[in-house]
Amino acid sequence: MNKTYDAIVIGGGHAGIEAAYALAKRAFNVALITLNINRLAMLPCNPSIGGSAKGIITREIDALGGMQGYFADLAMIQIKMLNTSKGPAVWSLRAQIDKEKYCQIILDDIKKQSNITLIEDEVVDLIVNENQCHGVVTKENGNISAKVVVMTTGVYMNSRILRGTDIKYDGPDGEKTSSSLSKNLMKYGFEILRLKTGTPCRIYTDSIDFSKVEKEQLDKNELSFSSHSNVKLDEQTCCFLTHTTAKTKEIILNNLDKSSLYSGIIIGIGPRYCPSVEDKIVRFQEKETHHIFFEPETAKGDIMYINGLSTSMPESVQDQMIASIPGLEKARVQKYGYAIEYDAINPLNLYKSLESKTLSNFFSAGQPNGTSGYEEAAAQGLIAGINAANKLDKMPMMEIKRSSAYIGVLIDDIVTKGTNEPYRMLTSRAEYRLLLRNDNVDERLSQYAFENKMISAQSYNKVLDKYKLINNEIQKLKDEYVSSNSELAKKYNVTSGVSKLKLLANPAVDPKDILGNDFPYLDEITIQVRLFGYLKKQESAAEKMFRLEKLKLPIDLDYNLVENLATEARQKLNQIKPTTIGQASRISGINPADIQMLMYYLNNRKK
């Protein structure tokens, strides 16, 4: 077996797959070391990709040359656009995925990649010399050397599965866990966090009484995540809606002392925005019911994922809870819900490139950085992979602005503010969310992708041509006026002197009446025109912030030398080592007076 590679990726989950593909796309030889090569990119938590904000992240991954959206399209059994009753800033795709097909597609495809080598093994330590990472130590194959290492271990570091007092030292779904790596990371200066997540039970579909639940109504559509998958679903697989009952609430409250979460067995901190059912019952006791969704795990549909019933209760209590829910009175359980605790590193140790501040050539991505979700993991894996490749190519690190992508918001948040709970992306976290829409990911990110060798010149020019066509059409509409005796004027009560552009800006107007059925980018141009004033305001605000991002801070700056800084500011700046004034301004506890002192200090240094 080869023992030397350009790059090593530790872990074959969603982050690891993106990192490996990014490095391979850049023509580097990659060793992808994972505990089970037949379980690549598992979907152990839920059988879906996307969701509010998350779907936009998957689209951003695609625009940057990543793979998640492409593979999701190939394995999806349902897709829909969320939040369509609201403004386009929060429209986001969500797809139900055939979880077995998804893993198989990725395994088959990765085996075709000549410069990715799959190695089934456990990484137990790093090879480190003078604060530089030079490879990994594995349990079965010993030392494997590389110029860069990307850690994407998911929830597998020192993980344990909990149901009541029943504890198993396993990874998700009974997979192996990695018991040594996080312990060894501490000796290289990493602070280890203990976090928690969970998953609900799975039920055999033929044991569900569907007469007691509500079937989701879905229209056929031509939606997809990827711009190059060319996949359109012929048929949508439906989900179903039911709810907890007063009996469910009673069972949970009477058995709280048996929950791993409430009995004190769990020490890890769980995700705030994805609570267990017992957590929901306790926190929202005024509510008598909570929504429960049945989601098929595969195209076969023989197993249902019971969304909304995540729990760490013992199996006997779960049986009672399940039987109290309409439609599940006689349900047969395929797998019980559980909580999982795992180790992660403090992401304040990382630069925006996702390279460690204390261990050169070592990058980290995904859940070991304190985030939750397949989409957040894949996004970080892609950025870490691109920047690891940039390091090998001696190119500048790629740092995506907050005003350019949710991915930029995600990474800036975790490396600037840190986290003590699994971080989930929300639209509310983005101050420029009108700019970060589902429809314009290619416009926002294609230049990043092209400059970092992730898409071809042909692909990049195709995007430039698209927006040139849109801008030309906008100018044309601006110059064309609606004739007072035209059908258009009669339909919309238009008097003379109204341009077609102004008419298109009216939400009551059907864009096809102005642009026809054949204009290829109907949604994009309509959104641009109707949000024009709001977009200009956000672009102006983003530009002001970007001026602060241009003011670089030296990595080796000793903030004890900066006069008149508050003590808290001095401590946090020395810990986080922000790279720009803009990043420094977003650290909690840093106030405007501290920023003024920093800028004054920088100006004096230049003199």
UniProtKB/Swiss-Prot annotation:
Entry GO CC: cytosol
Compartment(s) where it occurs, according to its Swiss-Prot or TrEMBL record: Cytoplasm
PROSITE patterns xref list: GIDA_1 (PS01280), GIDA_2 (PS01281)
Binding-site list for FAD: 11-16, 123, 178, 367
Keyword presence, rRNA processing: no
Keyword Transferase: no
Binding site for NAD(+): 270-284
MF (Gene Ontology): flavin adenine dinucleotide binding
Keywords: Cytoplasm, FAD, Flavoprotein, NAD, tRNA processing
Cofactor: FAD
GO BP annotations, alphabetical order: tRNA methylation; tRNA wobble uridine modification
Primary location: cytoplasm
Quaternary structure and interacting proteins, as annotated: Homodimer. Heterotetramer of two MnmE and two MnmG subunits.
Function noted in UniProt: NAD-binding protein involved in the addition of a carboxymethylaminomethyl (cmnm) group at the wobble position (U34) of certain tRNAs, forming tRNA-cmnm(5)s(2)U34.
UniProt record similarity statement: Belongs to the MnmG family.
Name this polypeptide is given: tRNA uridine 5-carboxymethylaminomethyl modification enzyme MnmG
The organism of origin for this protein: Metamycoplasma arthritidis (strain 158L3-1) (Mycoplasma arthritidis)
Gene encoding the protein: mnmG
